[in-house]
Design a protein with these regions (language model features):
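Polyanion-binding surface elements
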Residues: 9
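Vicinal oxygen chelate
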Residues: 1-6, 28-115, 126-127
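Short glycine-/small-residue motifs
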Residues: 121-124
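Conserved active-site tyrosine of GNAT-family acetyltransferases
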Residues: 18-23, 91, 119
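Alpha-helical macromolecular-interaction surfaces
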Residues: 16-17, 86
């Protein structure tokens, strides 16, 4: 049996606010998507990233939002270190919380961490 990652979903409180963050990160999200309860973007690698304001309410009525610590760590790869620095500066300059400024990891990757509007820490990586 072969298992493959097909989709990653983010439950969001405010679709427009969340999509604005991910557009600034560099994702190509349709401009008319801000008022939708569910938005999907298929990435170049075939994985679909989706945002949803209604799924949890409709299919898991007893769901309680998680608290404390990482809920998940979506990671986005950029072309090079300069792109990581520029994207981090753009996002934090727009008021998004910089979780950790760009740094080199022990395994040679260059990354930064920024919190999206729903509290998910997003990794921005090159290398």
């Amino acid at each position: 049996m072969s298992v493959q990652l097909s989709m990653v979903g983010l439950v969001v409180g405010d679709m427009a606010r969340s999509l604005a963050f991910y557009r600034r990160l560099g994702l190509d999200i349709p401009a008319d998507a801000d008022d939708r309860p569910h938005v999907e973007v298929r990435m170049a690698n075939g994985v679909t990233l989706f945002w949803d304001t209604a799924f949890a309410k409709a299919y898991d009525p007893n769901r309680e939002p998680p608290s404390g610590g990482y809920r998940m760590l979506p990671e986005f790869f950029l072309a090079d270190r300069g792109a990581v620095d520029a994207t981090y500066a753009t996002l934090t300059g727009r008021g998004y919380r910089g979780h950790r400024a760009p740094f080199e990891t022990a395994f040679g990757a260059y990354m930064a961490m920024v919190d999206d509007p729903d509290g998910n820490t997003v990794l921005i990586t090159a290398g």
